[in-house]
């Protein structure tokens, strides 16, 4: 053992103490600096008041302290208090097994937790806080960025002032905020407040998961009647929503591939598919089996009165009733018929049967040898 300095003390085998009142009191222990102390096997203390109290631990810096085996404290008043803990920086504190604190005032207080950055804090098991004043308090949580906060299990917050406070939630972007289970937000000040939702884009937010299998009042182009539509593949299978804006801010989603169109499809469709559906949604009007007009979804069929007819259109349940009436008084150029009966009077190819009725107001007929006029 070797001791150099006033009141230096080296009592362990191969121990070394150098400095005023230094102590190396275990085998292979080394203490360097006034009042430095190495009190465990293979421990090293370097700096004024540094203290290495556990086997193979290293304390470097004024008042640095190690209390865990194979731990390391580097920096003024740094502290490594558990096995294999590492504290680097002024006031850095790693108090749990295999924890790491790097940065002035950084603190890692849970198993395998890592805090990297000035005043960063990791207090959840296997959590990681990266950035000045970042916080990771949930198990397996990740907070990256100045003042980022991940406070629940498996939560991820990346970006300055980002916040993730729900299980399995992810917030990516400056001041992004997610508070619902398994929700994801990406973008500056994006917000996610509904479970399993995905919010994309700066200032976007998610809406409530309100899924209804029946749309009760779906109408097209302002038609007077409405259509009830039933959807397959919805309701019970819905897990969340994807938002790219909020109530006031909207975005286009471009270059979308054509989705499958079936009775059970849940694919997104693009503008060209909607255009074709709209274009083909009308119908043709024929005249004696010949197309004469195309009526699109916002078109109209107009029924007009004729010379001797009158059209009446009445509203029905998602339908219209069309009645064509013959006027009481009609005007025709000629009538061709094999038989005509008016009351008791019958006119046909065999002659006129007056039905025992008078024929009045007969004009004077011509009286001649070949006349066929009535007289």
Spell out what each predicted region is.
Residues 240, 281-322:
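Extracellular receptor-binding modules and their adjoining Ser/Thr/Gly/Asp/Asn-rich linkers
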Residues 262-268, 368-371:
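Extracytoplasmic Gram-positive cell-surface binding/anchoring modules and repeats
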Residues 231-236, 246, 254-255:
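C-terminal accessory segments
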Residues 196-197, 240-243, 270-273, 305-315, ...:
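Extracellular disulfide-bonded cysteine-rich modules/repeats
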Residues 203-210, 248-250, 257-261, 279-281, ...:
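Acidic glycine-/aspartate-rich tracts in secreted/extracellular proteins
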Residues 1-228, 236-239:
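Periodic small-residue-enriched repeat registers in elongated scaffold domains
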Residues 242, 248, 253, 259, ...:
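Low-complexity, small-hydrophobic/phenylalanine-enriched stretches
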């Amino acid at each position: 053992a070797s001791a150099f300095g006033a009141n230096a003390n080296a009592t362990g085998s191969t121990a070394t103490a150098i400095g005023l009142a230094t102590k190396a009191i275990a085998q292979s222990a080394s203490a360097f600096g006034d009042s430095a102390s190495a009190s465990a096997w293979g421990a090293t203390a370097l700096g004024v008041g540094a203290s290495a109290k556990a086997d193979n631990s290293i304390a470097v810096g004024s008042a640095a302290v190690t209390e865990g085996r194979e731990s390391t404290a580097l920096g003024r008043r740094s502290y490594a208090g558990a096995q294999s803990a590492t504290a680097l920086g002024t006031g850095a504190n790693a108090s749990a097994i295999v924890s790491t604190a790097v940065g002035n005032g950084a603190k890692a207080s849970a198993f395998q937790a890592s805090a990297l950055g000035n005043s960063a804090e990791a207090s959840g098991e296997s959590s990681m806080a990266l950035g000045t004043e970042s916080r990771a308090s949930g198990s397996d949580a990740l907070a990256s960025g100045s003042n980022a906060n991940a406070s629940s299990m498996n939560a991820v917050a990346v970006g300055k002032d980002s916040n993730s406070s729900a299980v399995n939630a992810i917030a990516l972007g400056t001041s992004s905020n997610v508070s619902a289970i398994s929700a994801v937000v990406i973008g500056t000040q994006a917000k996610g407040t509904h479970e399993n939702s995905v919010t994309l884009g700066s200032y976007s937010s998610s809406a409530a998961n309100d899924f209804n299998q029946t749309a009760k009042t779906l109408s097209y182009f302002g038609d007077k009647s409405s259509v009830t539509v039933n959807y397959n593949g919805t309701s019970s299978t819905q897990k969340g929503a994807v938002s790219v804006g909020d109530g006031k801010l909207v975005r286009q989603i471009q270059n979308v591939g054509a989705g499958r169109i079936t009775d059970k499809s849940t694919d997104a469709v693009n503008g060209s598919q909607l255009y074709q559906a709209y274009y083909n949604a009308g119908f043709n009007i024929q005249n004696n089996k010949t197309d004469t007009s195309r009526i699109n979804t916002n078109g109209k069929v107009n029924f007009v009165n004729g010379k001797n007819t009158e059209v009446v259109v009445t509203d029905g349940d998602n339908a219209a009733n069309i009645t064509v009436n013959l006027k009481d008084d009609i005007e025709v150029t000629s009538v061709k018929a094999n038989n005509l009966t008016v009351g008791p009077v019958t006119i046909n190819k065999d002659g006129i049967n007056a039905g025992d009725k008078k024929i009045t107001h007969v004009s004077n007929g011509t009286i001649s040898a070949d006349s066929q006029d009535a007289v």
